[in-house]
Amino acid sequence: MIEADRLIAADNPVFRDEEVIDRAIRPKKLEDYRGQDHVRSQMEIFIKAAQMRQEPLDHLLIFGPPGLGKTTLANIVANEMGVSIRTTSGPVLEKAGDLAALLTNLEENDILFIDEIHRLSPVVEEILYPAMEDYQLDIMIGEGPAARSIKIDLPPFTLIGATTRAGSLTSPLRDRFGIVQRLEYYKVDDLQYIVQRSADCLNLSMESEGALEVARRARGTPRIANRLLRRVRDYADVMSDSHISPDIADKALNMLDVDVCGFDYMDRKLLLAIMEKFNGGPVGLDNVAAAIGEEKDTIEDVIEPYLIQQGYLQRTPRGRIVSDRAYLHFGIDRPDK
C-alpha cells in the first residue's frame, strides 16, 4: 500500500525500528509536554486533585489524529501519578480472558493504557463496563444451564484509552470516561521547540532556523517532525559537516520531496487529480480513489485530514472540492464554472 511508504505518514509502520529513539526523546513530565496547553493545564489539576485525595485518576480518553502524543501523554500521566502503566491495544485483546488477565494483574492505582480502543471487540468491551464503574470483573463459569456468574474484585485503577476515531466508540464505553481530552495539530513555534529539544537529546548541532525549517514542513505533527529531523541528520552527516543549518535542512527536505507546506507526493497527487481530472470538484471519494490508485480508508484517514485542516480541501455532501488556496499553491488558475 502506498501509504505505508510515506515518510510523513504519522502512523507509518516502516519506521517502527526507530521507536527506541522516539522513546528516548519523548517528554517524561507535564512541564515538558509542549503544544497542548489546554490539555496540560487541565491534567495538572486533575492529577494533583487525585493525589491529594489518594485516589486513582479518573478514567481518561485521549483522541486526535495520529502522531500528536496520545501515548506520550499516557506515560506522562503515569510518571506524574507515580504509578506503573500496562500498555496494550484494542486489536490485541481478542478474547475476554485477555483483558481479564491484564486487569487482575494490576496493582492499586495502576494505569491500563489501551491504544486504538475503538477496535475492541464487543465481548471484550462488555468486560470493561463493570471494571471501570465498580472495579469488578463479571466472569461466566461453565456453559448452558450449569453456567454461573462470579464477581472478582479489582484494585482501583485508571483506564486510559487512545483513539483516532472517537466517533467509532460506543456510547456506553465513551460515557464511562470521566476525563476526555482532544489533541490538536501543533503550531509551528511549538514544533520548532520540539525539534530543537529532540536535536539536543540526540546531541545534534542544529541552528534554531534549521529547526524552524523542519517544523514548517511537519504537518503540525511531532512524530513527523522527529522523523524528518532524523532524515535531515542523515543528509547533514553525508553531505556536510553534520551541522544542520537552514540551508542544509531545506536541501534535505527538498530531497525527501516534502515541500514548504509539508505536502508529499500523495498530497500533491490527490489535489492535482481533483483539479486536473475533475475541474476542482465536487467529486466522490470512489472516483478520487480510482484516480490516484489509493484505498478509500487511506485517503480519508491519512491524506485528507491535514489538507482539510489547512484549508486546501473541503468535504461536502456532493463530494470533495479543492479550495482556491490549493490553486494558488500550485500556481494554477481555477476553471470557470
UniProtKB/Swiss-Prot annotation:
Keywords: ATP-binding, Cytoplasm, DNA damage, DNA recombination, DNA repair, DNA-binding, Hydrolase, Nucleotide-binding
Biological processes, Gene Ontology terms: DNA recombination; DNA repair
Region (Large ATPase domain (RuvB-L)): 4-186
Annotated EC: 3.6.4.-
Cross-referenced Pfam families: AAA_lid_4 (PF17864), RuvB_C (PF05491), RuvB_N (PF05496)
Region (Small ATPAse domain (RuvB-S)): 187-257
Binding of Mg(2+), residues: T71
Top-level taxonomic group: Bacteria
Entry text on domains: Has 3 domains, the large (RuvB-L) and small ATPase (RuvB-S) domains and the C-terminal head (RuvB-H) domain. The head domain binds DNA, while the ATPase domains jointly bind ATP, ADP or are empty depending on the state of the subunit in the translocation cycle. During a single DNA translocation step the structure of each domain remains the same, but their relative positions change.
Quaternary data: Homohexamer. Forms an RuvA(8)-RuvB(12)-Holliday junction (HJ) complex. HJ DNA is sandwiched between 2 RuvA tetramers; dsDNA enters through RuvA and exits via RuvB. An RuvB hexamer assembles on each DNA strand where it exits the tetramer. Each RuvB hexamer is contacted by two RuvA subunits (via domain III) on 2 adjacent RuvB subunits; this complex drives branch migration. In the full resolvosome a probable DNA-RuvA(4)-RuvB(12)-RuvC(2) complex forms which resolves the HJ.
Function: The RuvA-RuvB-RuvC complex processes Holliday junction (HJ) DNA during genetic recombination and DNA repair, while the RuvA-RuvB complex plays an important role in the rescue of blocked DNA replication forks via replication fork reversal (RFR). RuvA specifically binds to HJ cruciform DNA, conferring on it an open structure. The RuvB hexamer acts as an ATP-dependent pump, pulling dsDNA into and through the RuvAB complex. RuvB forms 2 homohexamers on either side of HJ DNA bound by 1 or 2 RuvA tetramers; 4 subunits per hexamer contact DNA at a time.
Protein name listed in UniProt: Holliday junction branch migration complex subunit RuvB
Organism: Aliivibrio salmonicida (strain LFI1238) (Vibrio salmonicida (strain LFI1238))
Encoding gene per record: ruvB
